[in-house]
């Protein structure tokens, strides 16, 4: 199945965000591993991938790729996720959220930044409120235009991977009435912006691999927090998979994680039978 034609939607109205000093051009780039990514997002967008109307369920998922806040791994944590969701009647909206700006030394600088916790903290801490705002605005925008896209306004969720998991989990902790996700799925998530579990916290689907020390710690911590708050939560931990597997097929049980997600959606009434 090919992805249908898709619409790129600016996340914010003109002039709503301050881009002063954000001078690096957004572009496709490659990591030293050969991974194709997007870097230097200054103007956040949502890209709409809508399922065939004959199988559309009315459910929507905002998909947030990861990339250490320096880039977006937009294929195996973005468009490939959207393709699978569309095949199962689910509308997908890939979020390009704001990133650390990088220059001519990309991708070498990514490794240097990741090797220094102090340097990473200095770079990403100022970014956190911006990406949280992007996550909340994504939910708000999809809900505002739900009728246009054939989406049920009470079945709009958010999913993210690694840094995109941070966007997802932060959104699930720090929303207002217009930006509350109906469900959230942080996949091997980085630590979120804090805050107590809200009184009306959405159902949470957490997933990671045990051989991913960072994400397994975050996942178990927020499983406990949701449980202690009496909110619906499910946690899957695969013994192997590492960090960043996304839709890559590794010959491991983690290859089928997205099927577990769909089962969870059905169990909670977010995914009715397809037409």
Give the ranges of each region predicted by the language model:
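Short amphipathic alpha-helix adjacent to the substrate-entry channel of hydrolases
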Residues: 75-93
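Short beta-strand element of the alpha/beta-hydrolase
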Residues: 57-66
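Alpha/beta-hydrolase active-site loop
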Residues: 108-147, 257-260
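Primarily recognizes the serine-hydrolase "nucleophile elbow" in alpha/beta-hydrolase
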Residues: 127-201
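Short beta-strand/loop motif that positions the catalytic acidic residue
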Residues: 206-208
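Conserved alpha/beta-hydrolase "acid-adjacent" motif
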Residues: 213-219
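N-terminal cap/lid segment of alpha/beta-hydrolase-fold proteins
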Residues: 1-55
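C-terminal catalytic histidine-bearing segment of alpha/beta-hydrolase fold enzymes
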Residues: 227-275
């Amino acid at each position: 199945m090919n992805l249908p034609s898709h619409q790129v939607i600016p996340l914010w109205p003109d002039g709503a965000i301050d881009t002063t000093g954000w001078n690096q051009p957004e572009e496709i780039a490659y990591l030293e591993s050969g991974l194709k990514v997007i870097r230097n997002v200054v103007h956040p967008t949502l890209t709409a991938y809508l399922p065939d109307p004959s199988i559309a369920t009315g459910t929507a998922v905002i998909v947030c790729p990861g990339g250490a806040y320096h880039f977006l791994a937009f294929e195996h944590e973005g468009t490939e996720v959207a393709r699978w969701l569309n095949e199962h009647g689910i509308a997908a909206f890939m979020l390009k959220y704001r990133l650390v700006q990088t220059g001519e030394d990309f991708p070498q600088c990514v490794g240097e930044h990741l090797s220094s916790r102090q340097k990473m903290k200095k770079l990403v801490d100022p970014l956190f409120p911006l990406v949280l705002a992007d996550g909340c605005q994504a939910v708000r925008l999809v809900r505002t235009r739900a009728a246009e896209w054939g989406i049920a306004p009470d079945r709009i969720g958010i999913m993210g991977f690694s840094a995109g998991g941070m966007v997802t989990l932060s959104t699930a902790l720090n929303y207002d009435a217009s930006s509350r996700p109906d469900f959230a799925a942080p996949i091997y998530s980085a630590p979120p912006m804090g805050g107590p579990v809200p009184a009306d916290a959405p159902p949470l689907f957490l997933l990671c691999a045990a051989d991913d020390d960072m994400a397994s710690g975050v996942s178990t911590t927020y499983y406990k927090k949701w449980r202690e708050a009496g909110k619906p939560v499910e946690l899957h931990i695969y013994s192997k998979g590492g960090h960043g597997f996304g839709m890559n097929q590794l010959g491991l049980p983690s290859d089928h994680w997205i099927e577990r997600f769909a089962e969870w959606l059905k169990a909670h009434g977010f995914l009715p039978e397809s037409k």
